[in-house]
A protein has these predicted regions:
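Metal-dependent de-N-acetylase/amidase catalytic core
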Residues: 1-10, 27, 31, 51-54, ...
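Short beta-to-alpha linker loops that shape the active-site pocket of alpha/beta-hydrolase fold enzymes
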Residues: 41-43, 78, 146
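Conserved SAM-binding loop
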Residues: 60-63
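ATP-dependent adenylation/pyrophosphate-handling site
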Residues: 5-51
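Short beta-strand segments at enzyme active-site cores
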Residues: 38, 73-74
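Short, structured active-site "lid" loops
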Residues: 57
Length: 150
């Protein structure tokens, strides 16, 4: 029996992965691929109300259910404030998921004009370097999310 691929999708915000590659996610799930979605930030205080975050997380969970994704996590960093954290902290959080999940492939956001997308792109590139813990990764690819910042 062939080993199933394990794919990690890193999303700066809830919905970026679905807007950027929802069809691909559904196709991969239907083919038996194991998918893990890591969402780094969300609509959290101080810029948003806590209720806004709860709504977007529930929407993300519903989208994952439709797509067939059962493995996911939310890091709960406030949106547009990712760049306020020390780079090593973000790198470490993403690296931990890479080491724990041990993906074969990783999909990351294209580094467009949105600062959160650029920071997550950079941190994901650090986390997926070919070192011992992540050496089984055979592909790192970008997905694009059209947004108001394009």
């Amino acid at each position: 029996m062939m080993k199933k691929d394990r794919i990690l999708i890193i999303s700066p915000h809830p919905d970026d992965e679905t807007l950027g590659m929802g069809g691909t996610i559904a196709k991969l799930i239907n083919s038996g691929t194991e998918i893990f979605i890591l969402t780094v930030s969300g609509h959290l205080p101080p810029l948003y109300k806590q209720e806004d975050y709860e709504i977007t997380i529930e929407e993300a969970r519903n989208a994952y259910k439709v797509l067939g994704v059962s493995n996911f996590d939310f890091l709960e960093i406030p949106a547009t404030m990712i760049s306020d954290l020390p780079v090593h902290e973000i790198n470490s959080k993403i690296s931990k998921v890479v080491v724990d999940f041990l993906p074969d492939q990783v999909f990351i956001p294209f580094p467009d004009r949105h600062i959160d997308h650029r920071v997550i792109f950079d941190s994901a590139m650090v986390a997926t370097r070919p070192v011992k813990e992540s050496s089984k990764i055979n592909l790192v690819a970008c997905y694009e999310t059209l947004s108001e910042t394009h």
